[in-house]
Amino acid sequence: MDKLQRDGKEDTPRQRRFLYPLLFQEDLYAIAYDHYFNRSSSFEPMENSSSNDRFSFLTVKRLISRIRQQNGSIVPFVNCDQTKLVGHNRSFYSELVLGGLTAVPEVPLSIRSKHSLERMNEWTSFRSIHSIFPLMEDKIPHSNFILDIRIPHLTHPEILVRTFRRWIQDAPSLHSLRSVLHEHRNLIISSNLDQLILIASKENTRLSLFLWNYYAYECESLLVPLWKRFFYSRSLPYESFIERTPFYRKIEHIVIFYHKYLKKSLWFLKDPSIHYVKHRERSIIALRGTYLLAKKWRYHITKFWQCHFHLWPQPYRIYIDELSNNCFSFLGYLLSVKMKTSVVRIKMPDDSFITDLITKEFDPIAPTTLLIGSLAKEKFCDISGHPISRLAWTGLTDDDILDRFDRIWRNIFHYHSGSSKKDGLYRMKYILRLPCAKTLACKHKSAIRVVRERFGSELFTKSSPKERESIFLSFSKTRSQRERIWHSDIIQINPLINSCRKKHNLQIEPLFDR
């Protein structure tokens, strides 16, 4: 694998034809175990781990010898019988086999992505989810329509094998992958871990996530060449200035130029700007044009997916929203474009007059109703927003109770600090403060008034003074309530909104915290 990485810059086909022998190398399973098992160990309690789930080269040697006895087939070990594997449980052998099978196709793909990332800027804020919103804030107000795309569900395992042929030319590896995929036809359904339909609950998730990410990359890569060709086509891009708006309306986007020999050609002055953002299985395409142009893009995307993957992507998975009339949900926000009217005084040499200037403004709003629903799902309040005490936390110390409520509040506020309206966040803070006081009152068997006198009016005391000062300044009346702040450190999923998505069955993307 080190040799493959040293020669990865060449990316010759020879490097992709000898991947199957890696399945018989002991180091591959050690790397897969260290990469996957140790990563997930911090999220699993110690009581759930088994003493047999420890890596052993002796176990790997037995596994490789059994694979050789099966004529190189690894499928029998995916659903092997526990009685035939004395001393080790079935799940551990399945973990090793699927971990090794996942590590093999990752070799050429990781080499390619590694060298592509080396050519990028060292600025690391691109990992933040909030880095999407400044782009949308600058570009979406100049767009007319939004294509809200859900990546089509995978229907047949042979589609994945055919897409892997472009990067992996090792036939035995492809045959092994095909055997496992046909053995588990429901291996991959969605990128959401909670919606994965798996035959074995735990050991297939890593392979499923890898296959889904590769499948989503293939769906996305089909559109990039088309957008580049459209962008570099014979068009005259322009910037829309306010004082030139009547001029653009008069020419109706088309100008006829007469050349010699009286030949005329049409030059489109429409702005071919296409802005694209993606998160998990959802993609957003912002277009500047008419409704007919948006319908054409939906038709072409559907046809490209149909011809490339030999499946029928449902057209209803591509929604067309008009920004002037509708809002759309993305990454835990309700996004829309609203008209902003400003009074402007125009002064001329002889006279001056006052007129109204209408501009478009990006308007992200925190979905307060959905956030209250997620808190109700987690038993912090009822469906109407009335606070409820957390009786399950009464066995914790006072500091632990305060710390848990404080982290929930800071995560919600930190993520939705880009909201144009902060009134909903005031309500969320009120809802969380009362359950905190009620929980402490139930623990000490006292009244809420006594708890407030003991801990003060500010119950959330576990945050650092710098963070409390930042939150206080953000909510200060002297600051503009419409000021938006986008943070570059939000990279992890907050499970609070995941429960909200399950309950309301809406396409609301998960909330993120630091």
Swiss-Prot record:
Q: Main site of residence?
A: plastid
Q: Which compartments does it reside in?
A: Plastid, Chloroplast
Care to name a GO molecular-function term for this sequence? Answer: RNA binding
The record's disulfide annotation reads: none
Q: Has the keyword Chloroplast been applied to this entry?
A: yes
| Matching PANTHER family | MATURASE K (PTHR34811:SF1)
Record protein name field: Maturase K
Gene that this polypeptide is encoded by: matK
